[in-house]
Amino acid sequence: MWQSTKNVYHAVSAFLAAFCYGFPGKKLKIIGITGTDGKTTTTHLIHHILNSAHKKVSLISSVYAQIAGVKYDTGFHVTSPNEWQVQKFLRQSLDSGDEYIVLEVTSHALDQHRMDWIDFEIGVLTNITHEHLDYHKSYANYVSTKEKLLNQARIGIVNCDDDSFSFLEANSKENQRITYGIKNNADITPEKFHFTSPLPGEYNLYNSLAAICACLQVGVSAEEIRQSLKTFKGIKGRFEKIAADVDFDIIIDFAHTPHAFEEVLPTAKKNTQGKLIHVFGSAALRDQSKRQLMGAISARFADLIVLTEEDYRTEDVNEIIDQIAKGCFAEGAKEYATNEYKLALKSTSPVFFRVPDRKSAIEFATQKLAHKDDTIILTGKAHEKSLCRGVIEYPWSEHLAVKNALKRS
């Protein structure tokens, strides 16, 4: 009942916002990107390609909004801003003479009507995996909500290798659908469209294919796309290797779902000569069923794991860690106290520690665990600028926490 009331509020608010700003979402060519994982990178990839092809384009993503070359903060823990912010940005984009805007879209924003009164030229769906089931209640509901973007768009672009594809195919509307993939017979594949990219991992191959599909549909030439993909260096907090004067690597990534772990951890492991050290937690008041899965996947790929906080809000951080630890144990990981780290380093099995304070966890990983040729990967916070404890948002920077930890090492 509460959720329905909230959705009605947003639906009315979305109309009022669109009306007040002159319905800019009906006058721009808007490319929307949704999906559980990969939507931020895909959003920025499309923007980079269009910009490199000299198109007048702006973007709104979970990292920032860039309207007419000016960057704006989109807030704490935000992927899709509220309807008033979105309409304001669209109006600024239109007034600046833009033809296109690339918009990252969440399932929450679609379900709550925050994207109403926006005509999407193209809707891109990256994948639909285990996430947000606390909100959507079932995978089928989650898929149906994501599909709203495809059905609102003139052209829908979908990943035919994803588990959601059979459902989407069975329920597709009359609009045009274009597919991309690696394993199945898609419209766009690496064999049909040859390209190179500095981005690591198979998951970024999928992100690139999605961007290729979208940009081909708006008239960017194949050669322009290929050249742009070569020059895209990635974005903040997405498998970002931190420059530091140490003999081990540090990577910051936003991965916070089981599927994302299955993508980024093997990629990090493949590029690590020594041990892979994984520092992570799980956000509170979200889908609890993913926590044990994340612990198991981490133990499958990481050698040393530091379980810590990630926006524990009004839950007990130690109970969240307990739930993650069950997955670690299930994969044969052994638990050690932090003062036993020297003994733990000799273990041939995966090892995990509990360090509830994230700052202390990063210090422990950098100062005690990491040695030559190791890799530390910090997941879950990335670009976010706050850490929620209780009901208070405390200022937080993953990058600054790493910098300060290295100063003391």
Please state what every model-predicted region is:
Residues 1-7, 213-223, 227-237, 241-409:
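ATP-dependent carboxylate-amine ligase
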